[in-house]
């Protein structure tokens, strides 16, 4: 055989052809008209070294953010991940996206997910968290569905300052099922204006900090919610500095966990965070890992409350998670464990400081803040009319500039959303400022 990685010998092929009653490969494909046949036009075969070299050439056509100054956030953030995180998380013992149904052979994964749930509860100030959702947007949509089950109502009010793509996913999930989605506006501070809440509202959904980077006043939101449930979309790193949503009476907390050790890969690797109050646990979607004791008296971990799930009760399931993002949750658990409370707080503090330094320097150049509300590590500022073209030009200069917002918020006119994190250096900022002149 010319190709040792193909397992079939000439004798194997001959035996299979004899079994189906044809004399050759050509006869096997004779039913395909000649007019429909064409050459595969494949390049000449290469050895392993040649293949590796060619793949390296192709990969070098890609753009790597490692050599870019990055000021683009909007839900996905460039952060530093200690090498030990992936050294541990990529061990073959852990490397699967599948649910650990068989507890007796999955104790390591189950314990890691239990620790992840515990740390999410500590960050959010909630009582129970699940072992992952697909991403922040679908977690918000599932939170709205959960609020409908809990209240028997069919309307959700979502702040227009929530990520526009999250709101789009929310509508995709809800409107074709007959549920109502109403958007609440925002004021000059960038915070939500709640005028649409009534007795028919199942839940209010706000983002904290919101898409504009502004820190919402959750006391105000809670005071205007009436009997509606409060859903808060969070950026988890910010909670190392900000008061957790649970302290303000949040009923459900969701968010995107990419900041917790996951890379900025195109289209994913995402992680949906989902936490709630214990009294609502039976209506919560997603896997739940619990701690117990086995027959020998040893600590053991297992999936719990599985009667909520589709593999037990398909018709009445509150959870329809199949192949899931448990491995992403495991990475987040390792990252949070490695960083610890002090390390995560330092990441948040540096992100806050870098963003405020960037804003001050831009203001010195005449770029004014659009909103007056306090912000975390992102902010909206006014830009010239030709900024979208300049944005593309900056990308060619290895600067991933602040996001133009006119396509998302036409009413804001010529504005952009800038982001800084703990990896944003003063040299990066000077490079951006020079490009903005």
UniProtKB/Swiss-Prot annotation:
Give any GO molecular function from the UniProt entry: glycine dehydrogenase (decarboxylating) activity
Which terms are listed as keywords in the entry? Oxidoreductase
Q: Does the keyword Oxidoreductase apply?
A: yes
Name any Gene Ontology BP term: nucleoside metabolic process
Signal peptide start-end: none
Enzyme Commission number, as recorded: 1.4.4.2
Question: Which reaction is catalysed here?
Answer: N(6)-[(R)-lipoyl]-L-lysyl-[glycine-cleavage complex H protein] + glycine + H(+) = N(6)-[(R)-S(8)-aminomethyldihydrolipoyl]-L-lysyl-[glycine-cleavage complex H protein] + CO2
- Asked if the keyword Oxidoreductase belongs to this entry, the reply reads yes
Record field: transmembrane: none
Q: Name the domain of life.
A: Bacteria
Subunit composition? The glycine cleavage system is composed of four proteins: P, T, L and H. In this organism, the P 'protein' is a heterodimer of two subunits.
What the protein does? The glycine cleavage system catalyzes the degradation of glycine. The P protein binds the alpha-amino group of glycine through its pyridoxal phosphate cofactor; CO(2) is released and the remaining methylamine moiety is then transferred to the lipoamide cofactor of the H protein.
Which protein family is it in? Belongs to the GcvP family. N-terminal subunit subfamily.
Its recorded name reads Probable glycine dehydrogenase (decarboxylating) subunit 1
Per the UniProt entry, what species is this protein from, by scientific name? Answer: Thermotoga sp. (strain RQ2)
């Amino acid at each position: 055989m010319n190709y040792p990685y193909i397992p079939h010998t000439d004798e194997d092929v001959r035996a299979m052809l004899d079994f189906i009653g044809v004399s050759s490969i050509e006869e096997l494909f004779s039913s395909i008209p000649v007019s429909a046949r064409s050459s595969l036009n494949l390049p000449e075969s290469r050895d392993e070294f040649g293949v590796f070299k060619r793949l390296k050439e192709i990969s070098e056509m890609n753009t790597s953010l490692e050599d870019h100054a990055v000021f683009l956030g909007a839900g996905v953030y460039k952060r530093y991940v200690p090498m030990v995180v992936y050294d541990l998380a990529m061990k073959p013992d852990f490397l699967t996206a599948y649910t650990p149904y068989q507890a007796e052979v999955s104790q390591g994964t189950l314990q890691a997910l239990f620790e992840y749930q515990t740390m999410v509860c500590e960050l959010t100030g909630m009582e129970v968290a699940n072992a992952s959702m697909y991403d922040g947007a679908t977690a918000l949509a599932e939170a709205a569905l959960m609020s409908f089950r809990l209240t028997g109502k069919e309307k959700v009010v979502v702040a227009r300052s929530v990520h526009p793509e999250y709101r789009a996913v929310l509508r995709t999930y809800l409107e074709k099922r007959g549920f109502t989605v109403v958007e609440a506006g925002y004021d000059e501070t960038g915070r939500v204006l709640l005028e649409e809440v009534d007795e028919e509202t199942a839940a209010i959904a706000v983002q904290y900090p919101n898409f504009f980077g502004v820190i919402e006043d959750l006391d105000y939101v809670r005071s205007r919610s009436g009997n509606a449930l409060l859903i808060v979309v969070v950026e988890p790193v910010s909670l190392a500095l900000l008061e957790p949503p649970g302290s303000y009476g949040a009923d459900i907390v969701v968010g995107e966990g990419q900041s917790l050790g996951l890379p900025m890969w195109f289209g994913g690797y995402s992680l949906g965070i989902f936490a709630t109050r214990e009294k609502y646990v039976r209506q919560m979607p997603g896997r739940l890992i619990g701690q117990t004791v086995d027959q020998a008296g040893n600590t053991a971990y297992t999936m719990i409350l599985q009667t909520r799930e589709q593999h037990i009760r398909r018709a009445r399931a509150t959870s329809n998670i199949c192949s899931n993002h448990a491995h992403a949750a495991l990475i987040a658990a390792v990252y949070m464990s490695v960083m610890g409370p002090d390390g995560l707080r330092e990441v948040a503090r540096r992100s806050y400081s870098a963003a405020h330094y960037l804003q001050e320097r831009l203001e010195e150049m005449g770029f004014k803040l659009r909103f007056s509300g306090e912000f975390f590590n992102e902010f909206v500022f006014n830009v010239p009319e030709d900024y979208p073209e300049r944005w593309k030009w900056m990308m060619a200069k290895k600067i991933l500039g602040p996001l133009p917002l006119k396509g998302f918020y036409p009413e804001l006119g010529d504005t952009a959303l800038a982001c800084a994190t703990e990896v944003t250096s003063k040299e990066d900022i000077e490079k951006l400022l020079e490009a903005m002149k």
